[in-house]
Structures are given as structure tokens and as C-alpha cells.
Amino acid sequence: MAKLVTLHDTDGEVIYPQTISDMDYSTSEQDTGCKWIDGKKIYKKTIDFGALPNASIKNVDHGVANIARVVKIDGIISFGSNNWSNIPLVYQGVDSIYNAEFQVTTTQVHCATSKDRSNLSAIITFYYTKTTD
């Protein structure tokens, strides 16, 4: 059973309740201890995606079998050794240089870019249910 962690602001209001299992990351499949709206267990896995593509599409096998539904995708993009941003990358402006689209299929993590983003790298965590539960 995951332990509940509650963060409070200075007035004692709850900011973001989450479980310890939500804060654990692994390149191996993990049972999050949570359930999806259909009652199935939610699992997660973190992938070191490596460098983003140069105005193209890059696919990385994730090694998870029996995915029924992906329920969440998030992660970070690294702009060098000491500059990071969340995925999805939120950017104010219309310059597509910052665009990077991530998708998860039953076999791979896909990334598509419209410009050369090979100087950036990504770590992706995706959450999913399984057909075997």
C-alpha cells in the first residue's frame, strides 16, 4: 500500500496530495497502486528517450507487453547539463522550434519535431493499464 504524502502551503492548505509510489521512477514496470476509471491497475515506466530527432520522427521501443490504454504521458526535456523543462513543453509564442510531439503506442514511444532538436534529450514516463488485469 502506498503511503499518502500531503504537502501544505504556509496557511496549512493542501497543495498537492500524492502517494510515495507516484514519486518513484524506474526503467522497469511499476504498479502505481492506483486504479483507472474502469477499475484496472495503473502501471508506469520511465524511458530514457535520448536525443530528440532532427526535424523528423524517432521511435524507441519501451518493452511493455499487453498495454490496454495509456492514461498519461509526462517527462522532462534537457537543454544541456543544467536547464530542464516539463513535457509537455509549454512555450509562449508561435516559433515551432520548441515543438516536440510525444506519443506512446503498444510497442514504442514516438517523438516528432518540426525543427532540429537533436541538441535536446528527454526522459519520458508513461502510465497505462494492461489487458491482462
Which ranges hold each PLM region?
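Extracellular receptor-binding modules and their adjoining Ser/Thr/Gly/Asp/Asn-rich linkers
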Residues: A2-E13, Q18-A68, R117-D133
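Generic structural motif
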Residues: T27-E29, K72, A100-F102
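Solvent-exposed beta-hairpin/edge-strand motifs
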Residues: A65-I77
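Extended, low-complexity, turn-rich repeat/linker tracts enriched in Gly/Pro/Ser/Thr and Asp/Glu
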Residues: F79-N82, R117-S118
